[in-house]
């Protein structure tokens, strides 16, 4: 009948700290007894276990020192030592029966009982306080309670209110079962319990699970919202960039279709009553290259072109050059559709002559900047009719209204009815 030497040899040295860390983790994950105070700090217990092994008539002591126990929450924090004694009878290991007895060894040669510790198994339908109180009534100096079968070396901080008269600790099931089997083989096992280290506060596995799930949900929601927000901003930025590029490209095309004019000596814009460029606030000079917008306002080419690229509107009247030239931009997807009337050439021809006509009465800011030579109105009507005949040959039925562009409604009153040319339906 040999002693359980394997455990004693393997636990010597520095294995106690690593086991303690593992037990601390298991303690946090293990369920607590009803009424336990999981938020309180927990004290571990150093255990010095020794076996008196009879061998060929000679007693030999084998010991092991480890930090494998946990003090109960209502237990006195003090050291205690004694011989481990289980309850009598194989079915009484839980010590839930109030008539449970313990067979305590006596000092050799006398009837005086030695100092002893009750070795009790957890469970059986009674509380920790019932087990510890029974051990105290039977004269034990302390109670060592080992965990359920199947829990290996997991331990929990016991709560046993009303049973704080003696030291009470809990050890793992594997540890307690090994000691119990040694006692049942007739080996006397002695345990010295010393106060270990303070750990805490402790939480049970339900708290850890709740905190973990909550943290995961919050983190996932935060990351998901950040990804969604970033993707949305990136998509909007790309769409805006595409739109701006498209608008700039259309603005370049529109600027290329606007008329340019080089001012000469004798032009109204250079005379004593001449106006200045609204962008750079400088007077016009001979040989200045000016841009004529669709609203008949003129500006220096170098001044107004950068403005038109960014804003696409007249700096003075906010007239949109894209719309004035028949370019419509779809704001939703940035697509651009060109809508040029059939009578575009006719309208341009008519409007150019009418702008020359209005330049006599309008101010330099709102006046036309066409050349001084104006063809008679009869020639304008004749050329218009020729263009309409050309359109009539290319289409069976075309209805075109040629309406001159008016930059300001106040000038419309000065126009005579015969300056509008309306072409009705022509059938071949």
UniProtKB/Swiss-Prot annotation:
Residues 1-38 form the signal peptide. A zinc finger (RING-type) spans 277-318. Residues 75-183 form the PA domain. This is E3 ubiquitin-protein ligase RNF128. Pfam families: PA, zf-RING_2. Glycans are attached at residues 48, 59, 101. Residues 416-428 have a biased composition (Basic and acidic residues). SMART domains: RING (SM00184). It is an enzyme of class 2 (transferase). GO terms for cellular component: cytoskeleton; endomembrane system; membrane; perinuclear region of cytoplasm. It is a single-pass membrane protein. Auto-ubiquitinated. Controls the development of T-cell clonal anergy by ubiquitination. GO terms for biological process: protein ubiquitination. It is found in: Cytoplasm; Endomembrane system; Cytoplasm, Cytoskeleton; Cytoplasm, Perinuclear region. GO terms for molecular function: transferase activity; zinc ion binding. Its EC number is 2.3.2.27. Pathway: Protein modification; protein ubiquitination. E3 ubiquitin-protein ligase that catalyzes 'Lys-27', 'Lys-48'- or 'Lys-63'-linked polyubiquitin chains formation and plays a role in different biological processes such as modulation of immune response, cytoskeletal dynamics or protein homeostasis. Inhibits IL2 and IL4 transcription, thereby playing an important role in the induction of the anergic phenotype, a long-term stable state of T-lymphocyte unresponsiveness to antigenic stimulation associated with the blockade of interleukin production. It catalyses: S-ubiquitinyl-[E2 ubiquitin-conjugating enzyme]-L-cysteine + [acceptor protein]-L-lysine = [E2 ubiquitin-conjugating enzyme]-L-cysteine + N(6)-ubiquitinyl-[acceptor protein]-L-lysine. Keywords: Cytoplasm, Cytoskeleton, Glycoprotein, Membrane, Metal-binding, Signal, Transferase, Transmembrane, Transmembrane helix, Ubl conjugation, Ubl conjugation pathway, Zinc, Zinc-finger. Binding to E2 ubiquitin-conjugating enzyme requires an intact RING finger domain. The chain crosses the membrane at residues 208-228. Residues 346-428 are annotated as: Disordered. InterPro entries: PA_dom_sf, PA_domain, Znf_RING, Znf_RING/FYVE/PHD, ZNRF3_Arkadia_E3_ligases.
């Amino acid at each position: 009948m040999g002693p359980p030497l394997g455990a004693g040899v393997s636990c010597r040295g520095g294995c106690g700290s690593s086991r303690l860390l593992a037990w601390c983790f298991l303690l946090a994950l293990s369920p607590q007894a009803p009424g336990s105070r999981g938020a309180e700090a927990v004290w571990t217990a150093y255990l010095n276990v020794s076996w008196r092994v009879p061998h060929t008539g000679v007693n030999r002591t084998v010991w092991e020192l480890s930090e494998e126990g946990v003090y109960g929450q209502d237990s006195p924090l003090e050291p205690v030592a004694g011989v481990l004694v289980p309850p009598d009878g194989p079915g009484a290991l839980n010590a839930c029966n109030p008539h449970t007895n313990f067979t305590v060894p006596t000092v050799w040669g006398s009837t005086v009982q030695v100092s002893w510790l009750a070795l009790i198994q957890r469970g059986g339908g009674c509380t920790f306080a019932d087990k510890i109180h029974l051990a105290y009534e039977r004269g034990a100096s302390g109670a060592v309670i080992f965990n359920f079968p199947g829990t290996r070396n997991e331990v929990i901080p016991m709560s046993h209110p009303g049973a704080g008269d003696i030291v009470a600790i809990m050890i793992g099931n594997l540890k307690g079962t090994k000691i119990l089997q040694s006692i049942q083989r007739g080996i006397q096992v002695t345990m010295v319990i010393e106060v270990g280290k303070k750990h805490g506060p402790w939480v049970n596995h339900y708290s850890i699970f709740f905190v973990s799930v909550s943290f995961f949900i919050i983190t996932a929601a935060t990351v998901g919202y950040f990804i969604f927000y970033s993707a949305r901003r990136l998509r909007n930025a790309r769409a805006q960039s595409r739109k701006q590029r498209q608008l700039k490209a259309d603005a370049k095309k529109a600027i290329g279709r606007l008329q340019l004019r080089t001012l000469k000596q004798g032009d109204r814009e250079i005379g004593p009553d001449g106006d200045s460029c609204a962008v750079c606030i400088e007077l016009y000079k001979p040989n200045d290259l000016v841009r004529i917008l669709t609203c008949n306002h003129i500006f220096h080419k170098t001044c107004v072109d950068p403005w038109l690229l960014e804003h696409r509107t007249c700096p003075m009247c906010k007239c949109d050059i894209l719309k004035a030239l028949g370019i419509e931009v779809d704001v939703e997807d940035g697509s651009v559709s060109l809508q040029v009337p059939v009578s575009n050439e006719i309208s341009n021809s008519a409007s150019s002559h009418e702008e020359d006509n209005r330049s006599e009465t309008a101010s330099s800011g709102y006046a036309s900047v066409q050349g001084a030579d104006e063809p008679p109105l009869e020639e304008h009507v004749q050329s218009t009719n020729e263009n309409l005949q050309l359109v009539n040959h290319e289409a069976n039925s075309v209805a075109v209204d040629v309406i001159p562009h008016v930059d300001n409604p106040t000038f419309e009153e000065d126009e005579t009815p015969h300056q509008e040319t309306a072409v009705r339906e022509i059938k071949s």
